[in-house]
Amino acid sequence: MDIKNLQSQVDKWINNHGVRYFNELTNMAQLTEEVGEVARIISRRYGEQSEKESDKNLDLGEELADVMFVVLCLANQTGVDLQKSFDSKMALKTKRD
């Protein structure tokens, strides 16, 4: 599934489940929280901190999906076509790197 379809899927889910988009600042705070959860798993599972027993059942993939969901929400709210932006960024990185 491409990014444009993911953006559409998130928008449909929000509109069909009786929820709404939080404002952009709230979603930015949500994104920070979700990235923190990813960081906790990585730092404890792959870094120098020991992984607590309560952290062993945390799913990195689910937490990354939470990050992606909020990023898609922010893109939808601000009118960003992430597919176009991602393709442009990859072309730039390919040329530059």
Tell me what each language-model feature is.
Residues 1-64, 68-97:
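Flexible "arm" and connector segments at domain edges
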